[in-house]
UniProtKB/Swiss-Prot annotation:
Source organism per UniProt: Homo sapiens
The protein's name: Ubiquitin carboxyl-terminal hydrolase 17-like protein 11
Compartments, as annotated in UniProt: Nucleus; Endoplasmic reticulum
Location (main, coarse): nucleus
Upper lineage: Eukaryota, Metazoa, Chordata, Craniata, Vertebrata
Listed EC numbers: 3.4.19.12
Gene: USP17L11
Length: 530
């Protein structure tokens, strides 16, 4: 089966000897093995072009860098709230963060894609273009997200917001690809979506015996941070790039001296993304329990200390969106987000409710996903704000007015019984599905040597399993936590603190978290000699 995974790929290997040869021109990564070189010695001209510009030869540039809109088309004020259709708070929170991503929003508002798209249905870029346009051009209103945005993913119960976020980003990246033509793996990393969210890791292993160096470059769309021992995002990043010693049973098999030897392994960011998605690993891979600790994150983040080249000056990112989970485990809870409108004002986006907020409140949340944009990018997009509407803050008056229009339901929508629409059930008609996406990722990631724990959950006989979790929740029938998460339609209107998005079967099956900060891919080898 052809690998259609959107941010998976192969591996490039270079060995510097005496003559340049190439056997796999369609690979997506680069590994360089060379003998000891001075720390700042330049590589050959051919290698410098491959590594510094595109890391590997590109057969086809799918989205030229100049195609990104240079000026902002976004209204200055905040846009619409999103109606909760029943356990869809994770969808709404993720969509709001994407809607207020400046380069993505500006491209969508330019309508460039829809004018040239030849796909008749199932195009996530066209769907997102319609959604972002409606959301930004309807301030003070509540709109209903298109069912096509969650088709193949949402099945009436609580899901993981980060998984849905990356599912959507991957679907948009896939929509950039010419479906009727074969595209090499590295060309897939030249799409407009990768230009916005993507970058490259650099994993460097230095043999301590012969001082030979091996560099491997892997693409990324988001960065997962372990927060178990970290009190701040900066500490988590420092742990991520901390050198690792390889010795003893874990000694490195050097490709230069051709023997097992102690080595030092260092992971750094080789190229920086315009938009940085940092996911804080708050949920246990086994139980799904939440790490409910405060992790500090700054409004301005300097990523230069974590780059391969650390002597090029500050690389400042500014915070523009925060995705928050309120609850005790991945099986239940409620998602909402904070976004920064182009006018510079922060807003809390809690389904249909849109209220003005402050940076102090934003920085005090137990964040799940953080969205940063390069400061130069933010300033460039902010210099040409559309003057069509005056900035204004939405407060209680706007919320009350929306409620009188019948847009808000009496009970919190997260606690209402979901109604599966026929459009969502007809999974076969959708081009991207969660199962297909997970299958492709599983095929291309490094397999663990053993499973720490595998627990089967028991589902009621009348439940249709549309997609399954990577790990099982492990709850038996009539488990107390399971009972507490079942719907109680006769309950009164919950308070804000009680409005947790439990869902019908929210405690039955969990959602797995990627356990690594980067996405490992199936390896492809290319031998280059000179």
């Amino acid at each position: 089966m052809e690998d259609d995974s959107l941010y998976l790929g192969g591996e490039w290997q270079f060995n510097h000897f005496s003559k340049l040869t190439s056997s796999r021109p369609d690979a997506a990564f680069a590994e360089i093995q060379r003998t000891s070189l001075p720390e700042k010695s330049p590589l050959s001209c051919e290698t410098r072009v491959d590594l510094c510009d595109d890391l590997a030869p590109v057969a086809r540039q799918l989205a030229p860098r100049e195609k990104l809109p240079l000026s902002s088309r976004r209204p200055a004020a905040v846009g619409a709230g999103l109606q909760n259709m029943g356990n869809t708070c994770y969808v709404n929170a993720s969509l709001q963060c994407l809607t207020y991503t400046p380069p993505l929003a500006n491209y969508m508002l330019s309508r460039e894609h829809s004018q040239t798209c030849h796909r008749h249905k199932g195009c996530m870029l066209c769907t997102m273009q319609a959604h972002i346009t409606r959301a930004l051009h309807n301030p003070g209103h509540v709109i209903q997200p298109s069912q096509a945005l969650a088709a193949g993913f949402h099945r009436g119960k609580q899901e993981d917001a980060h998984e849905f976020l990356m599912f959507t980003v991957d679907a948009m990246k896939k929509a950039c690809l010419p479906g009727h033509k074969q595209v090499d793996h590295h060309s897939k990393d030249t799409t407009l979506i990768h230009q916005i969210f993507g970058g490259y890791w650099r994993s460097q292993i230095k043999c301590l015996h012969c001082h030979g160096i091996s560099d491997t470059f892997d693409p990324y769309l988001d960065i997962a941070l372990d927060i178990q021992a970290a009190q701040s995002v900066q500490q988590a990043l420092e742990q991520l790039v901390k050198p690792e010693e390889l010795n003893g049973e874990n000694a490195y098999h050097c490709g230069v001296c051709l023997q097992r030897a102690p080595a030092s392994k260092t992971l750094t960011l080789h190229t920086s993304a315009k938009v940085l998605i940092l996911v804080l690993k708050r949920f246990s891979d086994v139980t799904g329990n939440k790490i409910a600790k405060n992790v500090q994150y700054p409004e301005c983040l300097d990523m230069q200390p974590y780059m391969s080249q650390t002597n090029t000056g500050p690389l400042v990112y500014v915070l523009y969106a925060v995705l928050v989970h309120a609850g005790w485990s991945c099986h239940n809870g409620h998602y909402f987000s904070y976004v920064k409108a182009q006018e510079g004002q922060w807003y809390k986006m809690d389904d249909a409710e849109v209220t003005a907020s402050s940076i102090t409140s934003v920085l005090s949340q137990q964040a799940y996903v953080l969205f940063y944009i390069q400061k130069s990018e933010w300033e460039r997009h902010s210099e040409s704000v559309s003057r069509g509407r005056e900035p204004r803050a939405l407060g209680a008056e706007d919320t009350d007015r929306r409620a009188t229009q019948g847009e808000l339901k009496r009970d919190h929508p997260c606690l209402q019984a979901p109604e599966l629409d026929e459009h969502l059930v007809e999974r076969a008609t959708q081009e991207s599905t969660l199962d297909h996406w997970k299958f492709l990722q599983e095929q291309n990631k490094t397999k663990p040597e053993f499973n720490v724990r595998k627990v089967e959950g028991t589902l009621p006989p009348d439940v249709l399993v549309i997609h399954q979790s990577k790990y099982k929740c492990g709850m038996k029938n009539h488990h107390p936590e399971q009972q507490s998460s079942l719907l109680n339609l006769s309950s009164t209107t919950p308070t804000h603190q009680e409005s947790m998005n439990t869902g019908t079967l929210a405690s039955l099956r969990g959602r797995a978290r990627r356990s690594k900060g980067k996405n490992k891919h199936s390896k492809r080898a290319l031998l280059v000699c000179q």
